[in-house]
Amino acid sequence: MRRYVRRGAALLGAGAAAVALVIGAGPGGAEPAAATGSLKMVALGDSSAAGPLVGTQSSLDCLRSTSNWPAVAARALGAQLIDVTCSGATTADLTGRRFGYIAPQLDAVTADTDIVTVAIGANDINMGGTVLGCTQPLPEPLGVSCKSWMTALGDTTDAQLAAVRPKIVDAVNRIHTRAPGAAVHLVGYLRYWDETGCYPTDPIWTVDAQWLQSIFDRTNAMLRRAAEESGATYIDIATPSTGHGVCAPYASKWVEGFIPTSAAAPYHPNQSGMDAAGALVASAIGR
């Protein structure tokens, strides 16, 4: 039995408290969080976890925030955090050196690790470039839908994601080898759009917003399947974030649009989103 399981009762209380709180209210290497509990948590992943431009940045190379959701979750769980999330990271950066000098993210996982969170996959299919490529200076029917020209030869999203899944499964298997007692959690992406876009407040047409959200949905489905295949746990943060996306009112927005209304990179979680995601992750880990 994993050592992590024996601490489940304490984690459950911490996770529940974190959710109640949120709903009610240097170099690119590893960054320890303030929490120094007996649990050791390692966070791997891309900008969805790193938090570019949110609060204080601990790494300019990786645009990593000290108040991102891994930090929020670690504090709620009373865990010591080693955060190696990095904006722009792909699955290749789990085992290879990003920019040629940032250590492979998996190097942060050691035999005494209790919890590992992994939030990655979207950059493998160039999701950031796809979203930005869908911004439109002109309203419908002027201009051209990005979906129409990006899928002119067919929508290759599913094939691309099918190629990413075994890479994530392999990464989780490597984590199990490096830290046999660790619980591994694959964390999905927040929901960006609901049924419609909100042009011109955000310059993406509804037809394209719906298509982009379908890609996020399919990415999350891929992560869920990868978790099932590798003995990890999938954490869904998309469903609870419905109504908090790009088009939400300022006070309830968790994800910023093309022109951020609070500190965050375009089309990335803001601090409210990081706080909410951190609480959701802590609650899921504590179950």
Kindly give the residue locations of the regions a language model identified:
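Short, solvent-exposed beta-strand-terminating loops
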Residues: 121-137, 188-195, 239-246
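N-terminal export and membrane-targeting signals
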Residues: 1-16, 31-34, 160-164
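Catalytic His-Asp segment of secreted/periplasmic serine-dependent ester chemistry enzymes
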Residues: 190-287
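Oxyanion-hole/transition-state-stabilizing segment in secreted/luminal serine hydrolases
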Residues: 52-54, 99-160
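Serine-esterase "nucleophile elbow" of acetyl-processing enzymes
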Residues: 33-88, 106-107, 135-140
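Structural recognition of the beta-strand scaffold that forms the well-ordered cores
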Residues: 40-45, 49, 81-85, 114-119, ...
